[in-house]
């Protein structure tokens, strides 16, 4: 099985889910109206998608840490490592804020925005690059 293809596919799904997270929160904040359902239903979906994203990111991170070879001379690889590390750190911080640090809740939208930016950066520097090479150059990266 091509683990890099699986990681790139999961990362792409994660980016789509992150876009859904943003749209759900925009509707919960009353900025747009796209999805049917009550606020409680949309909040439930936002939380469940977040749970799925956490599982996807932890699975991808595990394989990145245990299987990948880091090229310290590649700015793409280094930026991907930074995006990924910050992403997991901010996810942990958001979980702490939502569950136990209610004094920071007024900033949760900023934390969510940071998560979206970091997700986009991590996915584009990995899956985006993988699919670009595959499509444009006919090269499939393998471990």
Where are the model-predicted features located?
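Membrane-embedded alpha-helical bundles that constitute the cytochrome b-like, heme-associated redox core
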Residues: 1-143
């Amino acid at each position: 099985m091509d683990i890099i293809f699986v990681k790139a596919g999961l990362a792409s799904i994660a980016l789509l889910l992150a876009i859904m997270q943003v749209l759900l929160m925009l509707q919960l904040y009353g900025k747009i109206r796209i999805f049917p359902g009550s606020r409680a239903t949309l909040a439930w979906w936002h939380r469940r998608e977040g749970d799925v994203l956490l599982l996807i990111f932890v699975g991808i991170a595990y394989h990145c840490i245990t299987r990948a070879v880091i090229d310290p001379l590649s700015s793409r690889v280094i930026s991907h490592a930074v995006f990924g590390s910050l992403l997991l750190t901010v996810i942990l911080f958001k979980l702490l804020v939502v569950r136990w640090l209610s004094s920071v809740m007024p900033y949760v939208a900023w934390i969510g925005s940071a998560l979206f930016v970091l997700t986009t950066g991590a996915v584009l520097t990995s899956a985006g690059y993988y699919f670009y090479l595959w499509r444009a150059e006919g090269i499939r990266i393998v471990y």
